[in-house]
């Protein structure tokens, strides 16, 4: 059953990208965290490094196989990019799709299974606001963050 769900999701995503690629499409790939913001820390890895590797590995075949898809990265090296700049990159490039890559840490010996996908749902504003506050707490490590956010 799980394989059917995954196969269906991949098929739908592939068809969507293929149709969009015919018209011209801008995909912004955001490797979450970076620089002094390590993200989750594993016993032998940092989230920022995994995210960067996944983002580059995700973008490469799109660049190679979809000539009408413009791929834009928020970062290609281990640098810190403030959240407002990531949004500016997407807006400046008129992104059709913004994908932010993040990974989780696990306790030693635990096995990872599955994935998480987050999308904005407008009818649950209070709950969404709590999630947004938690997820965007990285803003507090930005230099002069008060100048960029309300």
Give residue spans per PLM region.
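Positively charged n-region of N-terminal signal peptides that target proteins for export
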Residues: 1-5
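Sequence-pattern detector for short linear motifs
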Residues: 6-7, 89
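Bacterial N-terminal signal peptides
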Residues: 7-16
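Catalytic-core regions of hydrolytic enzymes
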Residues: 20-149
């Amino acid at each position: 059953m799980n394989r059917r769900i995954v196969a269906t999701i991949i098929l739908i995503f592939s068809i969507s990208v293929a149709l969009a690629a015919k018209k011209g499409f801008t995909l912004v790939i955001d490797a979450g965290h970076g620089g002094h913001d390590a993200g989750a820390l594993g016993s032998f890895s940092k989230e920022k490094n995994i995210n960067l590797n996944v983002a580059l590995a995700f973008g490469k075949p799109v660049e190679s196989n979809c000539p009408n898809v413009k791929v834009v990265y928020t970062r290609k090296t281990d640098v810190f990019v403030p959240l407002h700049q990531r949004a500016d990159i997407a807006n400046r490039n008129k992104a059709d799709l913004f994908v932010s890559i993040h990974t989780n840490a696990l306790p030693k010996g635990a096995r990872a299974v599955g994935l998480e996908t987050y999308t904005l749902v407008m009818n649950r504003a209070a709950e969404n606001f709590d999630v947004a506050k938690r997820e965007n707490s990285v803003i507090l490590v930005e230099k002069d963050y008060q100048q960029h956010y309300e």
